[in-house]
Regions:
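Solvent-exposed segments in extracellular or luminal domains encompassing
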Residues: 298-303
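Short beta-strand elements bearing conserved aromatic residues within extracellular beta-rich modules
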Residues: 282-286
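Extended extracellular/luminal ectodomain segments enriched in beta-structured repeat modules
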Residues: 17-24, 58-62
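A short beta-strand segment in extracellular, disulfide-stabilized domains
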Residues: 266-275
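Proline-enriched interdomain boundary motifs that mark the N-terminal boundary
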Residues: 255-262
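Secretome/extracellular-domain signature
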Residues: 45-146
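Short proline/glycine-enriched turn/loop motifs at strand-loop junctions of beta-rich domains
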Residues: 20-21, 30, 276-281
């Protein structure tokens, strides 16, 4: 029986259908891009964030996964602000509604997100992705590019909002050939200011809990609340072949029995039993008024 599912960046929607059970979900955001030779020439990547949590699914559930891409590859998939080779890193998220990565209903159905790092240009730092919030991208001009938070996109210097990140989207600069993009995330990171390059902010992460912020139009209900949450800004430091793409992982922690009742009245009920691990379903006992009436040991998964 499969107990682990891994997802790498694919530039498209991916999906998985899980049986009832207790699971751990993990997401790593992608690193932001940089124009030039990082570190040796003074460029500093914004690293992707890491978020995880544990959830109990009480019914069979189909989930949609969007895995961010390293900003050096020049894509804007899953919220990365476009900036040529200095694009922001894409966010990695798991959501309840599929479709194109940027469709509004899909963005409003995300239950866990790891932010992407901000892109960087001209010997500055890109901000790291969240985690609880993305960090600041630095600028030689003092034009700060803030990271996304739980409640709003990162803000740049221009007061008209043209440099700011948005819900699910990092900022794309007016001149992508010489400026960096903000990291994707729950809320995306900003880029510094019109006409300036330098480092952009990282996107924020998110994990749905009882106390987490739910924006207007948000659709997931309390059945998708997580516990044992971990949110680490800049938590994706894995590099493979000079790139640090996002990734996602789902691990089955505990298999569970479950029962689907299709009809019932005062004298009879029609039901179907199953188990996350069918080999562990060995018998069905039914009771009336706490009195055992029958034990079924054959054809256990028939209706």
């Amino acid at each position: 029986m499969q107990t682990e599912w891994n997802f790498d960046c694919a530039n498209i929607e991916q999906n998985v259908t899980l049986k009832p059970g207790r699971y751990k979900f993990e997401c790593w955001g992608a690193r932001g891009g940089a124009l030039g030779t990082p570190f040796e020439s003074g460029f500093y990547y914004g690293y992707g964030g890491y978020c995880s949590g544990e959830i109990t699914l009480k019914k069979e559930t189909t989930l949609y996964l969007y895995v961010g891409i390293d900003g050096r590859k020049g894509y804007n998939f899953n919220g990365a602000g476009y900036g040529n080779g200095a694009s922001g890193g894409g966010a990695t998220d798991i959501r309840l509604i599929g479709g194109t990565w940027d469709n509004e209903q899909g963005l409003l159905s995300r239950i866990i997100v790891a932010g992407g790092g901000g892109g960087t240009y001209d010997k500055q730092h890109g901000g790291d992705g969240g985690g609880l919030k993305g960090t600041l991208g630095t600028s030689s001009t003092g034009a700060a590019a803030h990271g996304g938070t739980q409640f709003e996109g990162g803000r740049g210097r221009d007061k008209d909002g043209s440099c700011d990140g948005f819900f699910g989207k990092g900022a794309t600069p007016e001149n992508p050939s010489s400026q960096s993009g903000g990291g994707g995330g729950w809320f995306g990171g900003a880029y510094p200011a019109s006409g300036f390059g330098n480092g952009s902010g990282g996107g924020s992460g998110y994990v749905l809990t009882k106390d987490s912020y739910k924006p207007p139009g948000y659709t997931p209900t309390s059945e998708y609340y997580f516990d044992n949450v971990v949110m680490t800004t800049g938590g994706n430091t894995t590099v493979v072949g000079n790139y640090s793409d996002g990734r996602a992982k789902i691990t089955l922690l505990q298999s569970l029995p479950f029962l689907t009742v299709s009809s019932y009245n005062s004298t009879q009920a029609t039901f179907k039993a199953d188990h996350t691990d069918p080999t562990l379903l060995t018998k069905i006992e039914y009771f009336i008024d706490d009195i055992l009436k029958e034990t079924i040991t054959t054809d256990l998964t028939l209706e």
